[in-house]
From Swiss-Prot:
Domain-level remarks: The presence of a 'disulfide through disulfide knot' structurally defines this protein as a knottin.
Disulfide bonds: 44-59, 51-68, 58-86, 70-84
Tissue: Expressed by the venom gland.
Propeptide, chain numbering: 21-41
UniProt GO molecular function: toxin activity
Similarity annotation: Belongs to the neurotoxin 19 (CSTX) family. 04 (U1-Lctx) subfamily.
Name of the protein in question: U1-lycotoxin-Ls1b
Keyword terms of this UniProt record: Disulfide bond, Knottin, Secreted, Signal, Toxin
GO cellular component, one term: extracellular region
Amino acid sequence: MMKVLVVVALLVTLISYSSGEGIDDLEADELLSLMANEQTRKECIPKHHECTSNKHGCCRGNFFKYKCQCTTVVTQDGEQTERCFCGTPPHHKAAELVVGFGKKIFG
């Protein structure tokens, strides 16, 4: 439902912008690149995939949105870099465990 609202908002914005005076300044290539940027923003990063460059783009899990968890990695050269992945934080894992256990007991 949220995706539909975002697409509708984008279309309303484009239509209102086209009725204004600024549409003549926009070329077709610029409009296509704007729509491509919107599409890539909607795509989310699955669990256990790298999110170093997009720390707020993780997908939703069963109950919660995955969080971007980062660690510092030291290479053989001694250089430190930050690597991040989408995962479930420990407190979310505990909540999912309790809910799963409750479903087994109460059906």
